[in-house]
Amino acid sequence: MAENRGNLTSYRPDIKVMDCTLRDGGLVNNFEFTDEFVKDLYEANVAAGVDYMEFGYKADKDIFDEKEFGKWKFCKEEDIRAIVGENDTPLKISVMADVGRTNMKRDIPPKSESVVDMVRVATYINTIPAAIEMANYCSDMGYEVTVNIMAISTAGENELDLALELLASQSKAQYIYLVDSYGSLYPEQVRRLADKYIKIAEKYGKSVGIHAHNNQQLAFANTIEACSIGVSLLDATVSGMGRGAGNCYSELLLGFLRNPKFNIVPVLKFIEKHMVPLKASGVVWGCDVQYMLTGQTNQHPRTAIAFTKAERTDYAKFYTEITGDE
């Protein structure tokens, strides 16, 4: 993988883009997307040359009530097929499985029975053994697999080193993900972490991906910084739609990448048709002061999300609440 390192303007044919609009964006609107929205997003991604499209979660119906969420919280096979048919396109279909929140043996069929190509296993650093078990199960079922270690900004250096070595050496995942869950990392930190991930991953023939959040308006900067180091699977969402402050903007990333296979125009047309009216309807996401503050203090954005829902604007008081500082 060392040969894939370069600078911000290097042409990298190994780079792949993952659209996470439905999955991360679903955390904003409870996964209540219309079929037209999903179908048009799928077609836009195909036309734009995007490599993977994440449809949502494989959530356990015994834990989450189907009546309380849109269908992309559960990603049933028939619902995906209603959008993509047999998916006779270069675009690959992905779903996310949360450790402890997915019944993998019941809800993840053999690849031969599914139009899904990739399962992304989401884990915290203290559940790595369970993530390895899930990753290996999905690999044995015939899927491409990633393992996404969340909230790494709160992990100790030795703890992270041990987790990465264990994951890289014992899992059958093709990708290990650097995830800035709190949007607290800066490009210099991302560069150091990406270098660490790559050095461990490449020992075992694996690659590295990145999933960034935009609390400090650094999701794009952090994504391309990781890319310049050699990270090759890049997550993005249309209009940055995602939990709280959102994610790296697809349109920013596609416009930046030096690869003629990518075409930004289909994404721009999708924004015109769907994202502008979605925001106008009152669906809220994106960087704001409260998300900036949780990012700067390396905290989960749940307090900022509650602040937003309450339509508060007392930012100084909020800062005191989350830090204890007057």
Model-inferred region functions:
Residues 1-326:
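Catalytic cores and adjacent flexible loops of soluble metabolic enzymes
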